[in-house]
C-alpha cells in the first residue's frame, strides 16, 4: 500500500467510524467553529488536566472531509499541551493552503498529514477556527 492509499484509508476510517463525534460530559473547553461558505459547524470539546489535553471530541455537522479532519485531529492532540495543539493547527492550515511547511513540522501532525492533498478546502479550515482559541 502506498502513502496515498494509507492517507485515503485514514480519511475514510475517520469519516465512517466517527468515534470522536460525541459530547464530552466533563469538557472544560468548548470551542465552536462555523464556516459560512459551506455551512459546516462543529464544537470542539476538550478535557484538560490544566495544561495537557486528556480527551477530545466534537459535535456538529459538515461534509465527510471536515468531520474526518476534526476526528483525526482529536486523536492527534490528546496528550499535547494547548499550546502544542494550537501550533499543530497552524501547521495544518499552512499545509492545506500549500504554504511552506517543513518535513519536521509535518511529522508533528501525525495522521492529520493524511489531508495534505486536500488543498484549499474551506471545510478543512473549520478545524483551525476551533483550535485557534486554545492558546488563550
Residue ranges and their predicted role:
Residues 1-35, 98, 116:
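Contiguous domain-boundary segments centered on the initiation and propagation of an alpha-helix
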Residues 128-129, 133-135:
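Conserved small/polar residues in nucleotide/adenosyl-binding loops
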Amino acid at each position: 500500500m502506498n502513502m496515498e492509499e494509507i492517507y485515503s484509508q485514514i480519511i475514510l476510517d475517520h469519516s465512517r467510524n466517527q468515534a470522536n463525534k460525541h459530547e464530552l460530559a466533563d469538557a472544560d473547553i468548548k470551542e465552536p467553529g462555523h464556516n459560512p461558505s459551506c455551512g459546516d459547524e462543529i464544537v470542539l470539546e476538550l478535557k484538560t488536566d490544566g495544561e495537557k489535553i486528556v480527551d477530545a471530541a466534537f459535535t456538529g455537522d459538515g461534509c465527510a472531509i471536515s468531520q474526518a479532519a476534526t476526528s483525526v485531529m482529536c486523536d492527534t492532540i490528546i496528550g499535547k499541551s494547548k499550546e502544542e495543539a494550537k501550533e499543530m493547527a497552524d501547521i495544518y492550515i499552512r499545509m492545506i493552503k500549500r504554504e511552506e511547511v517543513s518535513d519536521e513540522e509535518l511529522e508533528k501532525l501525525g495522521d492529520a498529514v493524511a489531508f495534505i492533498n486536500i488543498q484549499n478546502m474551506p471545510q478543512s479550515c473549520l478545524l483551525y477556527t476551533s483550535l485557534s482559541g486554545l492558546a488563550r
